Amino acid sequence: MKIHLFSQCLIDMFYPHVGMAGVQVLERLGCDITVPKKQVCCGQMFVNSGYNDAAKGAIKNTIEVFENAEYIVSMSGSCAFAIRDEYRHILADEPEWMARAAKVSERIYEFTEFIVNVLGVTDVGATFNDKVTYHKSCHVTRLMGIKEPPMKLLENIKGLEYLPMNRAEGCCGFGGTFT
């Protein structure tokens, strides 16, 4: 299956090992991955700060880069939500761009959503002999409605002991940007 990977800014700049691990998982599951070189920030940081007009350049670039992709996978629920939902609203006064955004929005998936709901995989063959917890991010859980896929994948990691987090569905605040 051919997919285009939306590589999120924070992963690119600060956590490239996370991006590489995600690529390895997808390749192991039989995906042929393209990481478009012309992609930039999705623009959601501008939108979250109230700068919708400033976001339009990044938004239009993302649409142009990904509009011919069959599947787009993002390891960031925030970016996936922005592309899936916010783009059409921000481009509402530009019908042609809004239509193009709508087509892209139908093809974007959050990482765990893609693995479980599209590939039909709940066990990626991982082993991790330690205790972990999981923060259920606002964008993934509440705005995108993705609740089961991350948990199904965690449940099937051999050796993993899952410890529920207090207030797991509370907002992390992302340094105040989302609150």
Kindly give the residue locations of the regions a language model identified.
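Iron-sulfur cluster-binding electron-transfer modules in prokaryotic oxidoreductases
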Residues: 1-179
